[in-house]
């Protein structure tokens, strides 16, 4: 493949962090019976605009009866985000990515956005594990973050001990699955019996 040729030439390895947009939408539809609207929260930093494009196409092709809205930190403050999400009803699913702002100060990082909107009645789903423990997320479809982190640390350790990065095989997680914070799921009014 082209990447492996470049890896040899430039001495790098690659760890893919896949995002499962279609699986997340399917999971949300299962967990929120009668879901009529999907709101995607993300910043303007790549790849969120690309995810927005993919989600628009997915909704148009497979869920034409569903409304879709992308709320971005590029055009909305945290206060505007809160107001937009606070007005949602139980037929709206919210899928969260990252929420960085242009200033990149610590007070503007995603976890603070999670904490700010955690009290909203609508259930928040996520495309990444971030926010599952303390950020208000009920769940999502994702790879196993702990396995990925172990692999990352192993890869770094191998490089620090002299192994050429290009000799380390590319890594792609293959253990993606639905993950839930069951306490939060119940507190947000979702039925745990609907979990896959």
Each predicted region: which residue ranges?
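Short hydrophobic alpha-helices and adjacent helix-cap/hinge residues
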Residues: 1-196
């Amino acid at each position: 493949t082209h990447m492996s040729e470049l890896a040899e030439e430039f001495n790098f390895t690659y760890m893919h962090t896949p995002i499962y947009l279609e699986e997340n939408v399917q999971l949300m539809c299962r967990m929120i019976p009668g879901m009529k609207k999907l709101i995607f929260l993300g910043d303007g930093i790549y790849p969120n605009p690309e995810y927005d494009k993919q989600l628009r196409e997915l909704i148009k092709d497979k869920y034409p009866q569903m409304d879709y809205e992308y709320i971005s930190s590029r055009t909305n403050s945290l206060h505007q985000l809160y107001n937009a999400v606070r007005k949602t009803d139980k037929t709206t699913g919210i899928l969260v990515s990252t929420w960085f702002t242009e200033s990149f100060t610590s007070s503007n990082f995603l976890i603070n956005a999670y904490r700010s909107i955690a009290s909203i009645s609508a259930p928040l789903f996520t495309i990444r594990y971030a926010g599952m423990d303390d950020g208000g997320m009920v769940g999502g479809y994702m790879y196993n973050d702990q396995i990925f982190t172990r692999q990352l640390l192993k890869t770094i350790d191998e490089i620090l001990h002299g192994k050429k990065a290009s000799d380390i095989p590319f890594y792609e997680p293959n253990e993606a699955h639905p993950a839930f914070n069951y306490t939060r799921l119940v507190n947000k009014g979702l039925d745990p019996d609907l979990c896959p």
